[in-house]
Amino acid sequence: MSTTITNSTAERKHSHVDICLNGDVAFSTPTTGFERYRLRHNALPEVSFADITTESRFLGRRIGAPLMISSMTGGYSEAAELNRQLAETAERFQLPLGVGSMRQALEDDAYRDSFSVVRRHAPTIQIFANIGAPEVAKGLSDKDLHIMLEMIRADGLIIHLNAAQELFQPEGGTDFRRVLDNIADIAAKLPVPVIAKEVGCGISGAVARKLLEAGVQVIDVAGAGGISWQKVEEARYTRRFGSDTRFSQEGIEELLNWGIPTAACVVEVDALRPRTAGGRPFSIIASGGIHSGLDIAKSIALGADLAASAGALLRALHHGTLEATITAWLQDLRASMFLTGSANVAELQNNRPIGDTAKQP
């Protein structure tokens, strides 16, 4: 692989973090949709707040809370320190952790330490490798898959589906043919689960069904309402070229805010249970605009097995408040569980919220 390509990939990874921290890249509309729902208050909770546990299970393993520190970064020099801090925090709270896209580590082994650092600092938690749909479309060799999994002793592989991001990315790859077939091939050969993840535009029930039938075991809906990766790439494009004339002025605003709200995605994907994939169980991760323990609680009550956050936790890490932020979120979650009479996460998942499209008891 040429130095020009690897250097440009590293530059892109670095600029992504910079823009997410300093740019105005949140969705204008739609919101996550969580504001449409109210958790169902229980005036007789019949549970002691002191006895409430946030512990849960994900892919057969105990986790400290139904929260994943989602895929953020890797593949450039400063990423190793960010990933070290994320890994140490995830280990402390016993939370699953996803790394950023590992494309750069496949292109240049000099960047592999920016990923492998996570396992050195988080020896006991679930850690997930990550690669994008454009690389899947081109075809990943068995060697590529082995390198990614072994690099972090991964408990699974995240495949991120990022069509809208690639559409806006200056150097984006927009040939998404063969992605589903190649996902099926990967899922069939890997010894670990495959997670299909959007990056902010959401996964509908119809698409989730196809992914599950292809052998995917976890759907991370990654809906609209948090960071718009279209806006991140638009910022990179205008930095480079000064203005964007690729789209009409009338259409670009809607394209920059394109996506299905996170809450709507969770409801649609949860509705597939248990009819999809021959009745085989699957897990749902709610991500895209998770900013509090109330968002986590609503995600679980709508049917997700856990929530995940990247942007909000990256900002907390940048400000030195990551551990305090997670602690506060988990206290929010425990308060929500107490007020709904849910002693554990499974009980919260059966406490359907009040809302226009929420399942009613």
From Swiss-Prot:
Span of the signal peptide: none
SUPFAM superfamilies referenced in this protein's UniProt entry, alphabetically: FMN-linked oxidoreductases
Cofactor annotation: FMN; NADPH; Mg(2+)
Keyword Magnesium found: yes
Residues involved in Mg(2+) binding: 166
Protein's cellular compartments: Cytoplasm
GO terms for biological process, alphabetical: isoprenoid biosynthetic process
Binding positions (substrate): 12-13, 101-103, 165
Enzyme nomenclature, EC number: 5.3.3.2
Gene3D superfamilies: Aldolase class I (3.20.20.70)
Gene Ontology cellular-component terms listed: cytoplasm
Catalytic activity: isopentenyl diphosphate = dimethylallyl diphosphate
Keyword set, alphabetical order: Cytoplasm, Flavoprotein, FMN, Isomerase, Isoprene biosynthesis, Magnesium, Metal-binding, NADP
Pfam families: FMN_dh
SMART domains: IMPDH (SM01240)
InterPro entries: Aldolase_TIM, FMN-dep_DH, IPdP_isomerase
Summary of subunit composition and partner proteins: Homooctamer. Dimer of tetramers.
NCBIfam families recorded: IPP_isom_2
Role description: Involved in the biosynthesis of isoprenoids. Catalyzes the 1,3-allylic rearrangement of the homoallylic substrate isopentenyl (IPP) to its allylic isomer, dimethylallyl diphosphate (DMAPP).
PANTHER family attached to this UniProt entry: ISOPENTENYL-DIPHOSPHATE DELTA-ISOMERASE (PTHR43665:SF1)
Family: Belongs to the IPP isomerase type 2 family.
Protein name per Swiss-Prot or TrEMBL: Isopentenyl-diphosphate delta-isomerase
